[in-house]
Amino acid sequence: MSYKVVVVGATGNVGREILNILDEREFPIAEIAALASRKSLGTEVSFGDKTLKTNDLASFDFAGWDMALFAVGSEATKEYAPKAAAAGCIVIDNSSLYRYDPEVPLIVPEVNADAIFECHKKNIIANPNCSTAQMVVALKPLHDRAKIKRVVVSTYQSVSGAGKEGIDELWDQTKSIYNPVDNKPPTKFTKQIAFNVIPHIDVFLDSGDTKEEWKMVAETKKIIDSE
């Protein structure tokens, strides 16, 4: 059996990597569509030996397509994911929008694959934060043997999590360290990121935690306790 697959946000770093993985793993695809915003319309992306031209997300008809892999921000997901789901297309969302929705399963296949059957409520499956996904794979067998009460974890995350702007800022600052004439102050991050570690991802909450820290707690509980 093969599937008709849509990749939403195909011109972004994550969207391009999704296309690469689908090809590398020889996912059974009958037809594939690459979608992007109007400003990226017509941009070409690679899919194996093929080149795909991006279509306009705003005008795309999801009817008749089996699944849509969303690799865009929460705002675009909020607008278009329900339309895709209503058209009968299973949405797999990489943003944080649906992660905490009680009617949307938050899936890490190695941990709670059976929870996927709950996706019929909204036709949407959520993908967790990358740090959460790695952590719960290690925690699950321990939790099964002896219920975990507390976890102390440190994560060190790449600037790619901040998108292309984060990657560009790291590159520019790294160059400026070796060529001080071309010194560029931070704009994407609160401090210099080159050769540095900043204990600040996303916004600070009233509790004093960052939203990234809160995400890991909430997502871990939802994934491990989904059974």
Whereabouts are the PLM-identified features?
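N-terminal Rossmann-like NAD(P) cofactor-binding subdomain of oxidoreductases
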Residues: 1-193, 208, 226
